Amino acid sequence: MAMTATAEGMRRKRAFVGARGGSFGYLLPALVLVVIFFIVPVLMLLMRSVLEPEPGLQNYKALLGSTTYLRIFLNTFLVAGVVTIISIVIGYPVAWLLAIMPEKWSRLVLAIIILSMWTNLLTRTYAWMVLLQRTGVINKTLMGLGLIDQPLPLVNNLVGVTIGMTYIMLPFVILPLMGVIRAIDPAILRAAALCGATSMQCFTRVLLPLSLPGIAAGALMVFVMSLGYFVTPALLGGTSNMMLAELVAQFVQSLVNWGMGGAAAFVLLVVTLTLYAVQLRYFNPNKAR
Amino acid sequence: MKNKIAIALFSAALGFAGAAHAEDMVFTSWGGTTQDAQKASWAEGFTAETKINVTQDGPTDYGKIKAMVEAGNVNWDVVDVEGDYAVQAGKLGLLEKLDFSIIDKSKLDPRFVTDYSVGSFYYSFVIGCNKDAVKQCPKSWADVFDVKKFPGKRAFYKWSAPGVIEAALLADGVAADKLYPLDLDRAFKKLDTIKSDIIWWDSGAQSQQLLASAEAPFGSFWNGRLTALAATGVTVETSWTNNITAADSLVVPKGTKNKDAAMKFIAHATSDQAQASFATATGYAPINLDANVLMDGELRQTLPDMQAETQVNADMDYWAEHRDEIGTRWYAWQAQ
């Protein structure tokens, strides 16, 4: 049984490598699409950031020289970082459970998680607003139980953004993690236990290191997506913890200052790509496997 | 059999040609109850009269207008924009000149007519209050800025636009006729005193949600949204003291392929009948001076143009000129 599975795996691997080495042509349609509809517009935006209102780097100077805008940059990283950490902490046990559950149950739980991803983002965010506001269900219940006498400020601030975004990002942590944990041979854990490892040691010395590629993949995905998030911070956050995407929207839509908007978007792009490069270099999940 | 197919094909081709001939145009506005009323009061009658189909789009986005005009690919034929933007965009060459041989401007409120725009409707920022949620409602802008007498959160319009700066200055004691040029330093200093108690609303629907749920039991609102909210059974108190008026405008982005239809649409939308019907539905004031007589007398009394006593007219020309400067400062202040 194990033998056939391995042989099958080898065959698949050969077929995959063959396709990769064989023809670059398969890539072409997707590549053309990306170049025309993504790379070219991004370059045009970049051009605007150094050409409008006049040629030069004044937009970047204004952006990076202002404490207000720097605060927005810092806040963007803060929110993305906090959301990433909380998503991993909450998502890891779920992914673990999904990986070891009987298939019938894990399918059901997975379906629930994915179903929430298919619901409209705006609807989900408004739902959080209704739950979290001062007169919302959560505050009313807590006050009714006598646990608090003043409503907790759960929305229009960092707390609201973090709750709303973590909820949206969770599936992006759970799915890659589940895949990685499932691929870990349970025999290794049994072996560790047989050799006298406590269950805590089994987790910290065996399971955790082996699932690190999944954590890295999930964390990067969440962090990068969070950096450019717009709807949720706009609705659940306050103006004093604005994120970069909101700043870009203000420049582009309201102030119609595309030079500054382009500069802000480009800084975000550069930071994101840098992080991606770092991740590929140090935590490449494909290399680790 | 072959004949039948040929006939079917032929008639299908004819049908196609016929469909292509009927004119289409796109009207873009801000969505929500306001655009619903624009559709019902303006677009439907216009289509019945002219056979020109009007597709609704939205929300209005100044970035998109600029992109369309620059790319020479204009998909929006008539757009509802804020008055100060209309003045600025006209100067920047983003708009078509309106054809006043089709649009009769003699009956339109001259305050809102430029070469490139006419008024769409006009509204007031008023003090709205959810009576069931507070002991007493603020009556003046000074009250709204007084956190001791009126504790709790208050709602204000998030975007940089005429309204909040004026309210801050009025609250700080500036006389209504001495508002312009705006003393921004003074306004922001006053706004600083209530900053942590402000909840910003970025759409009319959100403002209604905040007030109805008492998340922010009072604040500055578009008067029409309060009328709509009161109609749903919420006990809303409106104070018209120093209500600050501003108008939306109708404009045509430069390079539209349906210029003729666009001009006809504006002519229809600003007609006395269409304006009266829209005002009745929304609680915003008509910009056609003949619309008054067509409206119910009692309802008439609740519209912004009947509240002229302590009314403050936001200076659209001043705003058009300083829009970028105020906006940059506004958003930087918000983010601090």
Residue ranges and their predicted role:
Chain B
Residues 253-313:
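Mature extracytoplasmic/periplasmic domains
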Residues 296-336:
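Extracellular/periplasmic bilobal clamshell ligand-binding domains
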